[in-house]
Amino acid sequence: MRTVLCYGDSNTWGYDPTTGTRLPRESRWPVRLRRALGGEWEVIAEGLNGRTAASDDPIWEGRNGATYLLPCLRTHMPLDVVVIYLGTNDVAMRYSLRAEDVAASVGRLVRIVRTSETGPDGSAPELLVVCPPPFSRVDPQYALEAEKSRELGAAFAAMCSELRCELLDLDGVAACSDLDGFHLDADGTAAVARAVEERLRRLTD
């Protein structure tokens, strides 16, 4: 059996934009992924509301994805694949990051995984970087964040090309809910699960 770790934020945790609570278990994308992969894979969901790639949140503690990643990898090792799906929270104005800075922060996570020795027999796990979809309809007060979210695709592509890692850009694959503009509804989680399944099978064939 192979093991994949899904490392992300509230969209991996399963935030429900309709209710403001958590999606039913069967509607979260890592659970959908587990069901699609069948008995071949163990799927570990490591999603946290508000998690960033590598920035300290001035309001909430423990949201920096870079500081928790290595302990997380070691907790769940050996891992065949790590899926990193972060970047949505990093475009918030309080972090003052450009799209290129967000991509570089995710690149830092890529390097942590590659030097972690948490794959089979002390190797590095395979990697899949997921670029969040652009924000959909948002309140005007988030217009700058929405604009920055539309720039992530190109920035992530450049970073993944430089680091030679697999990229899944969700722009055109899954859409954020119009209710809040940046969380996935049930249709969105289904689309993410399908796309990640396809890439996992390609990565591990």
Label every PLM stretch briefly:
Residues M1-L48, A54-I59, C72-R74, V82, ...:
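Serine-esterase "nucleophile elbow" of acetyl-processing enzymes
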Residues N11-T12, N49, N89, P133:
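Catalytic metal-binding/acid-base residues of hydrolase active sites
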Residues A45-G50, L170-A174:
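Acidic carboxylate-rich catalytic motifs and surrounding loops in phosphoryl-/glycosyl-chemistry enzymes
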Residues A53-D57, S177-D180:
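Short, solvent-exposed polar/charged micro-motifs at secondary-structure junctions
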Residues R63-D205:
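Alpha-helical cap/lid subdomain in secreted, periplasmic
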